[in-house]
Amino acid sequence: MVCTEFIETQRLYDQMHRVQRIRKLQQDIAIIENVLYNPSGMKWSDMPRSQNPNDDKKTKLMDDKAYKEKKLDIEKKMEQAEKHILEKIIEDISLLPENPKGPMNLVLQDVLRYRYLNGYEWEEIMKLMFPDNDAFIDMAESNLRKLHIWNGKALMKFIKCQQK
């Protein structure tokens, strides 16, 4: 891949990783809330009446939760702004000339949206795009190869649209 092509597709990869970071932060916050608000019998501090409130485990958890929520808000704002720009570029793929064998631009747009804007793993995309072929392992491998080929074609079309 040429350096300029790498730079042009890097926005997609950055967006995918941003979506994954958002999911991880949401999971972390849910775990902290579960520990904080469920009576699990957890010992909150080492001493019965701690003189130093900074040693209090509950305070540390609440601070950690506040930090992660702030970080989550920042990531979500960045994700929404970038998603809007990338969605416009992906929409432009439908304006490119179609392959005479069949309309593929919509499929390629779906692959880009699922993988990079929504941050889905390849197996999740395969289940969405090929829902009937779950039972056969050979079909799953074949469909996964198709997805990778479509991803390559979609990235090339994304580059063409971005250069306009």
Q: Locations of the language-model features?
A:
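Residue-level marker of regulatory loop/turn positions in helix-turn-helix DNA-binding domains and
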Residues: 67, 104, 147
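Residue-level detector of secondary-structure transition/capping positions
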Residues: 116-120, 133, 155
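Short amphipathic alpha helix immediately N-terminal
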Residues: 98-126
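Short, basic interhelical loop/turn and adjoining N-cap
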Residues: 130-153
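N-terminal interaction/assembly modules
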Residues: 1-100, 130, 152, 156, ...
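Generic alpha-helical secondary structure signal
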Residues: 84-87, 106, 145
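Intrinsically disordered, low-complexity regions enriched in Ser/Pro/Gly/Gln/His and often acidic
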Residues: 37, 115, 141-143
